Amino acid sequence: MPLRLIFMGTPDFAVPTLQQLVAHGHEIAAVYTREARPAGRGMKLQPTPVAREAQRLGLPVLTPKTLKTQESQDQLRSYGADAAVVVAYGLILPQAILDAPRYGCYNLHASLLPRWRGAAPINRAVMAGDAESGVMVMKIDAGLDTGDVAMAERVPITDAMTASDLHDTLAPLGADLMARAMDALERGELRLTKQSEQGVASTVTYAAKIDKAEAHIVWSNPAREVLRHIHGLSPFPGAWCEMPVDGEAVRIKILRCELAEGAGSPGDLLDDRLTIACKDGAIRVLELQRAGKPPMKAAAFLNGTPLTPPLRLD
């Protein structure tokens, strides 16, 4: 018999999981998401991606500011759910919420736990130069991403991958994994193991929330480190530098790059193809964004703004 589920999620990453749970025939009793927030040029209130998809599917949507009140906890209990599925929801779940569903609460986490517990596992994996990442279905306990693991899938990370690329790879993979986990739970076949028994990176690391102060590119770092920094922050908040354009220092976000040959003082433009010197070697810019403008290929940018040495980026 299909499970009666509560779904809790907010961003685009969570939408495929909601879709897969519905496709697998599970009953979604309620969808919890964050409240609508101002966005866009008009700063109009915009519902979250999960709220929009839930409304499209005809599912009831709740947007509590907290789950710590007795009222909110009683309301969640009233749904009589078998389990809750949590994907990048954004609110802390108190123990009363964790205990409410019959079989507990299950989280889809975008890393190979115990590596990169916390808020920004996708960004941190790319920034650290990890060889692989993945998704895990974990039964939530009182700790920060410390629960027992039910299922996992791995994917390689290449030098060409940005955080956006990895996000788009893991979202559908995780959706399928969670749906299969709930199918197994329905059959009474879901098995949990301790994170230390998963055969993944044994050292616990924490994926701190990305701070915009981290986004400034440091050209005096090694080229591969600069590449990982750029790709790990793409597209948001976007790694940036200042580039001299028509005598003015213009802030540019670099969204995609590749390793390149060349040598010079860190930050020096080495040719007319946006190859920039680092501590050792260089990177070539492939995609960038000026403030207030859409992202564009480097070739298109150079067509309108030709740049040649000598020139230094800060």
From Swiss-Prot:
Annotated source species: Nitrobacter winogradskyi (strain ATCC 25391 / DSM 10237 / CIP 104748 / NCIMB 11846 / Nb-255)
SUPFAM superfamilies registered for this protein in UniProt: FMT C-terminal domain-like, Formyltransferase
Function: Attaches a formyl group to the free amino group of methionyl-tRNA(fMet). The formyl group appears to play a dual role in the initiator identity of N-formylmethionyl-tRNA by promoting its recognition by IF2 and preventing the misappropriation of this tRNA by the elongation apparatus.
Catalytic activity annotation: L-methionyl-tRNA(fMet) + (6R)-10-formyltetrahydrofolate = N-formyl-L-methionyl-tRNA(fMet) + (6S)-5,6,7,8-tetrahydrofolate + H(+)
MF terms in GO: methionyl-tRNA formyltransferase activity
GO CC terms, sorted: cytosol
Annotated residues for binding of (6S)-5,6,7,8-tetrahydrofolate: S111, L112, L113, P114
Enzyme class: transferase
Similarity comment: family membership: Belongs to the Fmt family.
InterPro entries: Fmt (IPR005794), Formyl_trans_C (IPR005793), Formyl_trans_C_sf (IPR037022), Formyl_transf_N (IPR002376), Formyl_transf_N_sf (IPR036477), Formyl_transferase-like_C_sf (IPR011034), Met-tRNA-FMT_C (IPR044135), Met-tRNA-FMT_N (IPR041711)
Keyword check for Transferase: yes
Stated name of the protein: Methionyl-tRNA formyltransferase
E.C. numbers: 2.1.2.9
Keywords for the protein's UniProt record, in alphabetical order: Protein biosynthesis, Transferase
